[in-house]
């Protein structure tokens, strides 16, 4: 059914919701999990243009991805730390990495975060050509 599940994570409690679900799905289908975090701060958006060294924030993002890998024993898990606009990067990576499913969490009603994250979810789900699994964060 699924061979590669791209899971968008954001270093928040919402990640646990989506990972708990995807862990079971990947085990049932023997799918690889591709954990993707998109760093979208100013330094991340200009990282390549300015040839910057990794900031502490980017190092922390890499460490977080490795923690998530360690929390998924027995599963095939790879990671990708992308930099830039979250929606554009997720759309690009779904295609480049040949994901069969995109899994993301949505948030409750936190106005400002809903405006930002809601825009990402809306854009991504309309632009990718694979099924999108959306789970509301607990």
Mark where each language-model region is.
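Small/aliphatic-rich secondary-structure junction motif
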Residues: 1-52
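Active-site phosphate/pyrophosphate- and oxyanion-stabilizing loops and adjacent acidic/basic residues
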Residues: 23, 66, 122
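Solvent-exposed polar/charged
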Residues: 24-27, 70, 95, 126
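Short glycine/serine/threonine/alanine-rich loop segments
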Residues: 31-32, 75, 99, 130
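General small-molecule cofactor/ligand-binding pocket signal
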Residues: 34-36, 78-82, 133
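A short acidic, glycine-rich active-site loop
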Residues: 51-63
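Structural beta-alpha unit
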Residues: 70-102, 122
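Gly/Ser-rich helix-loop-strand patches that form or flank binding pockets
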Residues: 93-138
């Amino acid at each position: 059914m699924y061979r590669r599940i791209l899971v968008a994570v954001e270093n928040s409690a919402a990640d646990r919701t989506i990972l708990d679900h995807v862990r079971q799905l990947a085990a049932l289908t023997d799918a690889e999990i591709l954990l993707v975090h998109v760093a979208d701060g100013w330094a991340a958006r200009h990282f390549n243009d300015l040839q910057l060294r990794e900031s502490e924030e980017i190092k922390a993002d890499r460490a977080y991805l490795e923690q998530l890998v360690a929390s998924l024993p027995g599963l095939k898990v790879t990671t990708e730390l992308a930099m830039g606009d979250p929606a554009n990067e997720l759309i690009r990576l779904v295609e480049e990495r040949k994901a069969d499913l995109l899994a993301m969490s949505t948030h409750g009603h936190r106005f400002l975060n809903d405006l930002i994250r809601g825009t990402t979810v809306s854009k991504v789900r309309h632009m990718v050509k694979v099924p999108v699994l959306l789970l509301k964060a607990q």
